[in-house]
Amino acid sequence: MANEEVDRRAEILNAAVELFGTLGYYGTSLQKIADRVGLTKAGVLHYVGSKEGLLTAALDEVYDSETEDILTDIVREPRPLIADMWRRIVAVNARRPIQVHMFSTLSAEAIDPNHPAHEYFANHELHNADTALNIRWQVPEGVDTRRLLNA
């Protein structure tokens, strides 16, 4: 993809993240996104394929990428502290309130099994928990890491 196309796609994703956070998935139309970025609805679809494709990209590429980076960094550490992971996550989320708002809004909507992000949210915590459980955390003797992470 050429730089201009990458920039335009990022602009579309940013608009979608903001609108999904404010209006939810069902309240956000492709036309609203198109109006926000100065394209036609067909122009938006050229970059993202479908509204569900846009939702997936907003969650995977915009929201999850930073969280995954934190877990990847922690996995490389010999004996990380669980509290350090939470501090990093809080610090990242404090810098991205719009993305956190989107995540919160969509997770509430996705309780409905017919929501297009239902599976994503059903599996999201399981994936992160599995990753976290495979890290050799530095915890005091006798502390159940699984129980601590699930608290």
PLM feature spans:
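N-terminal intrinsically disordered/low-complexity leader segments
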Residues: M1-D7, V143-D144
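Helix-turn-helix
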Residues: R8-E11, A15-A57
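Solvent-exposed, amphipathic alpha-helical segments
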Residues: A15-T22, D69, D73, M102-T105, ...
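Short alpha-helical functional segments enriched in proximate histidine and acidic residues
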Residues: L19, S65, T131, I135
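Hydrophobic alpha-helical connector segments
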Residues: A57, I70-V100, N128-T131, T145-L149
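Short, basic, alpha-helical segments at the C-terminal edge of helix-turn-helix-like DNA-binding modules
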Residues: D60-E66
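Amphipathic alpha-helical segments used for helix-helix packing
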Residues: R95-A122
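All-alpha amphipathic helical-bundle segments outside canonical DNA-binding/catalytic cores
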Residues: E119-N123, W137-A151
